[in-house]
Amino acid sequence: MQNNVKKTVLNLWHKEHGGQMVEFGGWDMPVQYGKGIIEEHLHTRRFAGLFDISHMGRFLVEGEGANPFLQYVLTNNALALEHGMAQYTLIPNEYGGAVDDAYLYRLDEGNLSSEARYLLVVNAANKDKDWAWLNDRRKGFKNLTFEDRSEELGMIALQGPLAKGILEKILMKGHSALPDPWRNRLRVSEIEGEKIELTISRTGYTGEPICFELFVRADKIQKVWESILAIGEKDGVVPVGLGARDTLRLEAGLPLYGHELGLDSEGKEIPIFAAPSTRPAVSFSPLKGEWTGKDALRQQFEEMKLRLDRLPLPHKEKQIIPKRIFPVAITGQGIARQGYDVLKDGGKIGYVTSGTMVPYWKFPDTGILSRPAEERGKRAIALCYIDSDLEAGARVQIDQRGRALEGVVVERFLSGEAPPYARPIFIPALPGGPKHGVERAAVKMSESAERLVGRAVQNNLWRQRETINLIPSEATPSHLVSLLSITDPAHRYAEHRSIKAFGEKEVFYYQGTKLIEEIEELLAEELRQYFGCTEVETRVISGQMANTAVFSGLMDYLNRLDRKKERRRIRKVMNHHLGRGGHLSAQPMGALRDYVAHDPQTERPAVIAFPTLREDPYQIDLVKTEELLHLHGPEMIILGKSMIIYKEPVAEIRRMISGMNSKPLLHYDMAHVLGLSGPFYQEPFMEGADIVTGSTHKTFFGPQRGVIASNMAEGTEYEDLWEIIVRRVFPGSVSNHHLGTLVGLLMASYEMNAYKQDFQRDVIANAKTFARSLKDMGLMVEGNPELGYTETHQVIIRVGYGKGPEVAQRLEENNIIVNYQSAPDDEAFTAASCLRMGVQEMTRFGMEAKDFQQLAEYMKEIIIGNLSMAEEISRFRKKFIEMKYCLPEKEAAPLIERLLAVVR
């Protein structure tokens, strides 16, 4: 080994613990330890792997010139990074090739981009080249600090399913000390008892969904390394060398400079856009101005658009990206190695850039409860730089020293979207691949009908007689509501709209609709009374449709003065993040998608999440919220959550926005708490909400529908907006607005107005009793104990990281139906730590405080004691069959008989 080879601070530790050392990029690094590459790969995928990556280069960039400099020398948009975020990026040359790929981390805690501090991490083998390249281009950028911090700042990575739990054990303040549970987030934290400060980032180079990189002072890094292993070794965590790091990144389809980036086998530049994973790392935001390689990369981008849109391309010789990097699964026996030729139809179409045999754990089950078994397998995979015209499914051959290996182009080898595990992806006809379905024999319709009815009856009896339903978004309607919902209007149409020429009279486009006209008028009056408002729209058939109509209506309203131009979207929206319990329908991935603008700075949907308290992530941080409101000036604020245990700060936010020049629309989506609207919970219009939407079937007594309510009457500020929203409902959203359930909703509204005081008081009291009882039973209840853990119908308990689905399944087997729920610190629903429960349905079936105390005892025995109690729960449920808070059974019975006589 050369004398000038460099060593990380952990070099001696590696040697003392069985590290097989090799020279890599000028560094003396472990390629593997005693367990070997295969075991290190498997341990990372099932448990966690610990990597020394201090050999990588770390450059500090700060000062007023930092952003202009980074915008010029990197492909991504540095301005898109808010503090505590990171992004994958590349250092491009003028020809559209990569000098290197890199990661950029924003370290500061401020909001001003001019005060930002960045850390740029580059590949070890390219560090000196990158340093020289970047220094050559820093001239002309004033007030710029550009320093090499590689020696003083160490870097290690902890990757794999157990990584989160291990860090929680060594960090102060437990899970709240970790970064937010989304990719590319970072946070400064401290080792418990050691006073060692470290920056933790949710990034990595393995494809693991649970991934962390840690930046620590070099003189403290061994202490952190050993602390992690001391906690994790007994659970399967191992140190991992460069060998398994390479097989892990290859299985994840990630590029390696010198293989998938840089120069190809002929010495030509590999276009940056040839590698799929690099495309999101290139930004053409106008905020970047002119930057290195912009024109060349724009040409690559335009050609890729033509290809993906299946539009005519230039002749092959004139194409900028004639070859691309594709994942190829080897279907025959053998291993594809770097440099092997790839053939199709006898002709060479490219070569293998990376290839090996990788091990994998087998997942015998499917779905949310699937976990890796003890059985393992191996598969040969490769990344190949081959003809751009190929698509997934194409068959190719790889020349293994004169022997043809069969392969197939695939989309990917690995899936990381279901934390905590990364799962191997197979295709049919390959080893381990999914099996095709079996053809079904023909069955008589009468037999199918009998089977269907049998299953429906069985399920109805089980759900209505034997199970305790604690799903917070469900509620069984009364018999009268159910039967009215299937009367004749269920089969009819009654389209109508208000016509000004007829004095705002509702004009119906069908005959035979007088009942529906009467029903809608009565329903509107009942709901106006319930909400204490002037306007209601009842034709929406779900809460999501209600939200869509409001978003669409607001966008139309914002464009009302100039309808000749392309309509602009809502500039900015403030809402609850989905991972913090926000409604799916209020997200850019939900109903908001087509109506919110893209922020030109972040290049993401222009949505600002409510900040939450560190000590209570279920509670909005009102101090930070006010700062963000004045910083961003949103045009719409959406309150309301699907995981809602507190009152929403309607009045407080109304106060905050009252002095703004351009006031945002304050929208409260009460989906879960619509049936609690009143003095025991919240009265949104009295507190300052502009508009309320909701579902009528969660805490409200109705069948499954939606509603929109407001005080936007004629003569008010938002009169025009309300008219537009009504038009966005019809004809914008519905034609047939499900008339049967509309009839049922009127009956439910009668019940709600008659019994709301008692019901709302009892639901909230029962929820508090249930929460305290669960706590007394030794279960971990989320929420503020000073508020009784909840102010709504919902109760949330934490059952262990990733254990929510399994515990929910165990409870279902014991006739208790709950909803597994990701906690605010969970990465996804697949890693859910919590159970979300609601007491509203069982309260309506007559359960009281003492009954919820008993239920808490049963749940303790099932969750903690792992006892089987299905029969006991079934007997317990049979005490609560008769529905309350509705017309008494004696009065309802003759009405039910009359309805049964006509619907038979």
Which residue ranges define each predicted feature?
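N-terminal glycine-rich, Lys/His-bearing helix-loop that initiates the first secondary-structure elements
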Residues: 1-34, 433-522, 885-904
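Acidic, proline/glycine-enriched N-terminal capping motif
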Residues: 1-89, 97
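Conserved small-domain helix->loop->beta segment predominantly found in fold-type I
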Residues: 314, 320, 749, 756, ...
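Conserved PLP-enzyme active-site core in the AAT-like
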Residues: 438-441, 515-518, 522-536, 540-780, ...
